[in-house]
Amino acid sequence: MSGRGKQGGKARAKAKTRSSRAGLQFPVGRVHRLLRKGNYAERVGAGAPVYLAAVLEYLTAEILELAGNAARDNKKTRIIPRHLQLAIRNDEELNKLLGKVTIAQGGVLPNIQAVLLPKKTESHHKAKGK
């Protein structure tokens, strides 16, 4: 007897993605494919796409959290490029990482040089008191 009967074979386990094994939302399989197709190296280790997907997921979560806070500060429920710009430029480390990046429709940080602000003179206060 060959053992290929219906009752003899084991049921195949449900497929489990590498992303779910690593506890990630970002696609490990797709990152692996892109690493192979991108001609970055002749061979790609099994851990490399997992690590890269984890790093990308962390950076994305960090930026989105700060952008969500910026949107909430502006009393908005939808994140727009302006919120991403404010989030990145107000964070020292993200600003350094993405210093050369231009965000379309991002605008600029509000900034007025101290010299251009009106001077607070005490002569007006003394004149009113007399």
UniProtKB/Swiss-Prot annotation:
Q: Where is the protein found, in the record's own terms? A: Nucleus; Chromosome
Indicate the transmembrane segments per the record.
none
The modified positions for N-acetylserine read S2
Modifications made to the protein after synthesis:
Deiminated on Arg-4 in granulocytes upon calcium entry. Monoubiquitination of Lys-120 (H2AK119Ub) by RING1, TRIM37 and RNF2/RING2 complex gives a specific tag for epigenetic transcriptional repression and participates in X chromosome inactivation of female mammals. It is involved in the initiation of both imprinted and random X inactivation. Ubiquitinated H2A is enriched in inactive X chromosome chromatin. Ubiquitination of H2A functions downstream of methylation of 'Lys-27' of histone H3 (H3K27me). H2AK119Ub by RNF2/RING2 can also be induced by ultraviolet and may be involved in DNA repair.
* Impact upon substituting E62A: Decreased interaction with VRK1
- Indicate where the modification N6-lactoyllysine is found in the sequence: K10
List every position bearing Phosphothreonine: T121
Q: Where does cross-link Glycyl lysine isopeptide (Lys-Gly) (interchain with G-Cter in ubiquitin) occur?
A: K14, K16, K120
Q: Which SUPFAM superfamilies match?
A: Histone-fold (SSF47113)
Q: What are the Phosphoserine sites (modified residues) in this protein?
A: S2
Q: Where is the composition biased (Basic residues)?
A: 7-19
**N5-methylglutamine found at:** Q105
* GO terms for cellular component: extracellular exosome; nucleosome; nucleus
Supply the alphabetized keyword list: Acetylation, Chromosome, Citrullination, DNA-binding, Hydroxylation, Isopeptide bond, Methylation, Nucleosome core, Nucleus, Phosphoprotein, Ubl conjugation
Please describe what this protein does: Core component of nucleosome. Nucleosomes wrap and compact DNA into chromatin, limiting DNA accessibility to the cellular machineries which require DNA as a template. Histones thereby play a central role in transcription regulation, DNA repair, DNA replication and chromosomal stability. DNA accessibility is regulated via a complex set of post-translational modifications of histones, also called histone code, and nucleosome remodeling.
Question: Which proteins does it associate with, and in what oligomeric form?
Answer: The nucleosome is a histone octamer containing two molecules each of H2A, H2B, H3 and H4 assembled in one H3-H4 heterotetramer and two H2A-H2B heterodimers. The octamer wraps approximately 147 bp of DNA. Interacts with VRK1; the interaction is mediated by the nucleosome acidic patch, a cluster of negatively charged residues of H2A and H2B forming a cleft within the nucleosome core.
- What name does UniProt use for this protein? Histone H2A type 1
User: Can you name the source organism?
Assistant: Homo sapiens (Human)
